[in-house]
UniProtKB/Swiss-Prot annotation:
Domain of life: Eukaryota
InterPro entries noted in UniProt: CCDC89-like
Keyword Nucleotide-binding in annotation: no
UniProt protein name: Coiled-coil domain-containing protein 89
Keywords, sorted A to Z: Coiled coil, Cytoplasm, Nucleus
Amino acid sequence: MTSPQKIPIDLKMMIKDTKQDMDDVHQALEKLRSLSQEERTEAEVLRSRIDEQSTLICILKRRADEMLLRCQALEKINAELENLRANVQVELENERKKSELLEQRFMDLASNHRELINFKNEYKSQNAKLEKENERLRKENEALFSEEVQEKEETILKLTQELKDLAEQHKILENEYQEKTTGFQIKLKELMNLHRIKEASLKNELSDTQKQLKTAVEMCAELDLKLRQTQVKESMRETDTQERLEKLIKEKDELIDLSVQRGKIIRDKQVEIQELERKRQEAENGRRHAEDRFEKEAAAVNSELRVKELREALERAEFSCNELKKEFEAFKKHSCELLEKEKELNCKLRHMII
């Protein structure tokens, strides 16, 4: 991009060259003054024509430089709008991939829930079989022994009561797990809806960017037509043309500063989105690791340890879900702020172009 300091340097060089040409013309006129009266008359006519031609050449040269600077500024604005449109399309594709990933994870959670229900049913079936076997053995022992049978029967009753208590605790924990799983599924649906809203917002933003690009192209054609009309109407207004040139240079510098700030904001936004995605992935990996470890260790522990591990796994899952929700709310708030800033910059840019 052309630096703001380069244009004054080019203008100085143009002024220096123009002065050099005028000095050459003045030297030629000095030589003509030393000629005879008739030659002086011809020299004066020649000098008048040379002055008119040099003035016309200077005006045309400045107009050509002005038109070149305007065209370069408009081409750079169009290139920046194209880059912005490409970045928005990439961001839209990333959001779509995230939505698909969340759907896949939701299906995995549903599968895990079904496996847990099957495990519970199998546990109940085995418990019923053990109770029947226990009753059969108790009756056989009553027929064979008396006092020992009574003592063992009391022990068996205690163990049976403890087993029932554990079964009730397991049922309570199972209900809590189902409630928390339902809540987590609802939160996942909310996240998916938010992603869909974000995708629609990005599509609208892409459409606005395309409209801005079309408007810029139309403005370029309109400015070109106005430039031709200005060259015809203002051929003798040198001072006004110089002021317009300085104003356009100032506007171009402001547009360059706005474009640099906007590019920096977009890069910062992309870095923050990547950081939030990395944190969310870490939380998801931790949750998966906890579920895998729970499934591996479930068969190796007794009922009391299994209940404890279930409680800890539920607490970790709830904590991870809360952390993920907080990070998503922060990301949503920050994204809204960035969108507001971007809209303000777009309004300022359209105002400067108009």
